[in-house]
């Protein structure tokens, strides 16, 4: 087809579909004995887009992975946290099953938003990201500490939906099938059990602002970002279809739970004194009840909007070593792939992996701190390696992690000599 701007001689050309002349439209495209204008092309595009959305607003029943399949995928990327993975798999499956059946069901199904409780670096954010990637739905993260009530300086809670829309090019239907992860949710807890008479811009007030968004409302979002103003056209997003996952470390929550559990167990010389070895912190956190979260500082209405609670354990040394080498995207595999691009083999010895895990434990950063340790150890080598010829292998051992030596470089001729000598 060709772009026609003029007819033969002075005779004007007309769009075969709408009848407009070439002078009334921007472009007129010619085919064999027919013409179509740019306006009709745009209209056809809109019709096709609408048709596609109607055909597949939510994946078919066969396409929605069952809880066991979701759990299996999480196992490929996340080490440990078995109960949390089970809880998440069921909650996510039920959420998308609810979206599919909402029109057919006589009984209205409630939302199953999720609260993840676990120490820093235990995998809360990574679990949410992995789920969204597996389900192929839009995903965005927000930091609860940056949120404020409407009218105050800071981020409105509706900015969360704005970010989700940005992730899917402002496709409202796609956004309504998305997952939102709100981190540091424990940081907006009320500082005491008694409601404050002063305004709490980033605490209880934000909880109140998040209530409707998480439960389900039609949020009016400006498409171009920024604060709302009357001249803007708003996009209407139904948040009842969006899955919200909130996460936080909840430091000190174990003491609140212990206090509840110890009530009525007796005091004085005959009372049993529980040591830390008898009741580990992870086991205590797993016994969390809504009343504990209220005492911690979350308002009851907000807790009610997060009916599914999953607790994550603090990662021990063995778990960190597994994280370094077992998952599909394990750090050692990632760095090995980088070195392979230079035709160099990278080897982490067992004592090196243990030393990295111990370092992360000492820093109390969990899995989150592993990458910075490995990056720091390999930085010098990655800087020099592209300029050095003949390197076949790089070996990292315990002394390298301790900073006592540099990674060992083995050259191609050294390897040949070793192989020839039978070593």
Curated annotation (Swiss-Prot):
State the name under which the record lists this protein: ATP-dependent Clp protease ATP-binding subunit ClpX
Tell me which Gene3D superfamilies the record gives. 1.10.8.60, ClpX chaperone, C4-type zinc finger domain, P-loop containing nucleotide triphosphate hydrolases
Any one GO cellular component localisation term in the record: HslUV protease complex
Q: Which PROSITE patterns match?
A: CLPX_ZB
The function of this protein is: ATP-dependent specificity component of the Clp protease. It directs the protease to specific substrates. Can perform chaperone functions in the absence of ClpP.
The UniProt annotation places Zn(2+) binding at 15, 18, 37, 40
Question: Which family does the record claim for this protein?
Answer: Belongs to the ClpX chaperone family.
Domain (ClpX-type ZB): residue spans on this chain: 3-56
Give the GO molecular function terms. ATP binding; ATP hydrolysis activity; ATP-dependent protein folding chaperone; protein dimerization activity; unfolded protein binding; zinc ion binding
Keywords attached to this entry = ATP-binding, Chaperone, Metal-binding, Nucleotide-binding, Zinc
Quaternary structure?
Component of the ClpX-ClpP complex. Forms a hexameric ring that, in the presence of ATP, binds to fourteen ClpP subunits assembled into a disk-like structure with a central cavity, resembling the structure of eukaryotic proteasomes.
Q: What Pfam families does the entry give? A: AAA_2 (PF07724), ClpB_D2-small (PF10431), zf-C4_ClpX (PF06689)
Instruction: Fetch the InterPro entries from UniProt.
Output: AAA+_ATPase (IPR003593), ATP-dep_Clp_protease_ClpX (IPR050052), ATPase_AAA_core (IPR003959), Clp_ATPase_C (IPR019489), Clp_protease_ATP-bd_su_ClpX (IPR004487), ClpX_bact (IPR046425), P-loop_NTPase (IPR027417), Znf_CppX_C4 (IPR010603)
Q: Which GO terms describe its biological process?
A: cell division; proteolysis involved in protein catabolic process
Q: List positions binding ATP.
A: 119-126
């Amino acid at each position: 087809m060709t772009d026609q701007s003029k007819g033969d001689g002075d005779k004007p050309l007309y769009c075969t579909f709408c009848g407009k002349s070439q002078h009334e439209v921007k472009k007129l495209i010619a085919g064999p004995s027919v013409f179509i204008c740019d306006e009709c092309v745009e209209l056809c595009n809109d019709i096709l887009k609408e048709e596609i959305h109607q055909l597949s607003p939510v994946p078919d029943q066969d396409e929605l992975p069952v809880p066991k399949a979701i759990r299996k995928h999480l196992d490929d990327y996340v080490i440990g946290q078995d109960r949390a993975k089970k809880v998440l798999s069921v909650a996510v499956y039920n959420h998308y099953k609810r979206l599919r059946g909402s029109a057919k069901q006589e009984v209205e199904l409630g939302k199953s938003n999720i609260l993840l409780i676990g120490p820093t670096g235990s995998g809360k954010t990574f679990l949410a990201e992995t789920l969204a990637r597996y389900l192929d739905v839009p995903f965005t993260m927000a930091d609860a500490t940056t949120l404020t009530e409407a009218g105050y300086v800071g981020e409105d809670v509706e900015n969360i939906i704005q970010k989700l829309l940005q992730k899917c090019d402002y496709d409202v239907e796609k956004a309504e099938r998305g997952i939102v992860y709100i981190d540091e949710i424990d940081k907006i807890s009320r500082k005491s059990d008694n409601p404050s008479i002063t305004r709490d811009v980033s605490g209880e007030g934000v909880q109140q602002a998040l209530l409707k968004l998480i439960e389900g409302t039609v949020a009016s979002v400006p498409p171009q970002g920024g604060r709302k103003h009357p001249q803007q056209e708003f996009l209407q997003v139904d948040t009842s279809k969006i899955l919200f996952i909130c996460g936080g470390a909840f430091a000190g929550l174990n003491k609140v739970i212990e206090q509840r559990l110890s009530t009525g167990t007796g005091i004085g010389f005959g009372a049993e004194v529980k040591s830390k070895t008898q009741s580990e912190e992870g086991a205590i956190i797993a016994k969390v009840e809504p009343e504990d979260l209220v005492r911690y500082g979350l308002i009851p209405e907000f807790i009610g909007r997060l009916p599914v609670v999953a607790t994550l354990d603090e990662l021990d040394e063995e778990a960190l070593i597994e994280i370094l080498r077992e998952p599909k995207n394990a750090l050692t595999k990632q760095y090995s792939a980088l070195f392979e691009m230079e035709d160099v083999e990278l080897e982490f010895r067992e004592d090196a992996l243990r030393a990295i895990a111990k370092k992360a434990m000492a820093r109390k950063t969990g899995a989150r701190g592993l990458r910075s340790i490995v990056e720091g150890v390999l930085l010098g080598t990655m800087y020099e390696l592209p300029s050095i010829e003949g390197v076949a292998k790089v070996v990292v051992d315990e002394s390298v992690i301790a900073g006592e030596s540099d990674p060992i470089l083995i050259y191609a001729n050294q390897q040949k000599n070793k192989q020839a000598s039978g070593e």
